[in-house]
A protein has these predicted regions:
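N-terminal Rossmann-like dinucleotide-binding module
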Residues: 1-45
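Active-site loop of classical SDR/Rossmann-like NAD(P)-dependent oxidoreductases
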Residues: 7, 33-36, 273-287
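C-terminal helix-rich "cap/oligomerization" subdomain common to oxidoreductases
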Residues: 65-67, 217, 288-321
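Hydrophobic residues in well-ordered beta-strands that form the structural core
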Residues: 91, 117-119, 248
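Rossmann-fold dehydrogenase core element
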Residues: 103-123, 144-150
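Predominantly a Rossmann-like dinucleotide-binding segment in NAD(P)-dependent oxidoreductases
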Residues: 123-197
Length: 321
């Protein structure tokens, strides 16, 4: 693993440690410029050595997989270093924020088609999203008019983050690369051919507000609105399929639907505004990756999804400028 900031310590490493205890993986190296941080992590993993440089770690440990959890502007070089050595990659989002970044991703994937270039897209493992997805994908397949509305509100950037990259929209992606990209990834799962048709962004770094409009299927539309200028932490997803008289709402820890005018009882569900819930989703993400990394078809699909989502994000950022 390269990068031992908040994402690594709160989510990646606990999930990897559980997999290590279960015997399905061994953490063989950790890399970070902070000596105390890397040594402390290495001490908790029986087979791990600590390194200050990624190239040195890759050469010394010859891993099967490199997990990248550094700031976004470092991702492409670290991915390239791994792929050139025949190492699969799992990289934190975002993988790129420009059309040039996407072109380089395509080039890397094209030169190493046997390797996985996967992204951390753990939201798809949330059970409430799987319920929304089953309802929404029918609209895509049927070519129905339908809408998906997403709202994410935060009172500023993550105060637990080890760095300030989230407040740097020009170089690191800002709120589009931090929050909106999670939902672009979910929309891409609904329709791999979806397309960004509009994006607006305003406000200074760290207090941004952005909205992204995405076309889904023949007649579906989604809007993802994300704000760092909020007063609370909240996540909401709303699906409306008029042809089926179906409305689905997932707002924080509450899930409800209305079908043919009949409302269901509200169900208590995991909330994506709860950091503990988001962090816990890394475990099923890693279980899926570990179980399928030897499957060439899975690797190809993961890489295609990575590039598709990166292209959506790059299009949104380009339109917002």
């Amino acid at each position: 693993m390269v990068g031992i900031g908040s994402a690594a310590t709160r989510a990646h490493l606990p999930a990897l440690r559980a997999a290590e205890v279960g015997g399905s993986v061994s953490v063989v190296g950790v890399c970070d410029p902070d000596r105390d941080r890397r040594d402390a992590v290495a001490a908790r993993h029986p087979y791990a050595a600590a390194f200050a440089e990624n190239d040195e770690m890759l050469a010394a440990t010859t891993p099967h997989l490199l997990v990248i959890a550094t700031p976004p502007s470092a991702h492409l070089e670290e991915m390239a270093a791994a792929l050139e050595r025949g190492v699969h990659v799992l990289c934190e989002k975002p993988l790129g924020i420009s059309d040039a970044d996407v072109a380089r991703l395509r080039d890397l994937a094209g030169r190493h088609p046997e390797l996985a270039l996967a992204t951390v897209q753990q939201y798809r493992h949330a059970t409430p999203w799987q319920w929304v997805s089953r309802a929404a994908v029918g609209g895509v397949r049927a070519g129905e008019p339908f809408t998906v509305r997403v709202g994410v509100e935060r009172p500023g950037t993550d105060p637990l983050s080890a760095g300030g990259w989230r407040a740097d929209p020009e170089h690191e992606g800002g709120i589009l690369g931090d929050h909106a990209v999670h939902y672009l990834a979910l929309l891409h799962l609904l329709d791999p051919h979806c397309a960004v048709v509009a994006c607006r962004r305003e406000g200074p770094g760290g207090r941004e507000v952005a909205s992204v409009d995405v076309r889904l299927g023949a007649a579906g539309m989604a809007r993802v609105r994300a704000s760092y200028a909020g007063t609370r932490r909240t996540n909401a997803v709303h699906l409306d399929r008029p042809a089926q008289c179906l409305d689905v709402d997932w707002e924080d820890g509450a899930f409800r639907l209305v079908h043919d005018g009949r409302p269901s009882a509200t169900r208590e569900v995991p909330s994506m505004s709860d950091r503990r819930v988001v962090n816990a989703l890394y475990s099923p993400m890693y279980a899926d990756l570990i179980a399928h990394l030897d499957d060439a078809s899975w690797r190809s699909t993961a890489t295609a999804r990575t590039i598709g989502v990166a292209a959506l994000l790059a299009a949104a950022i380009r339109m917002a400028r």
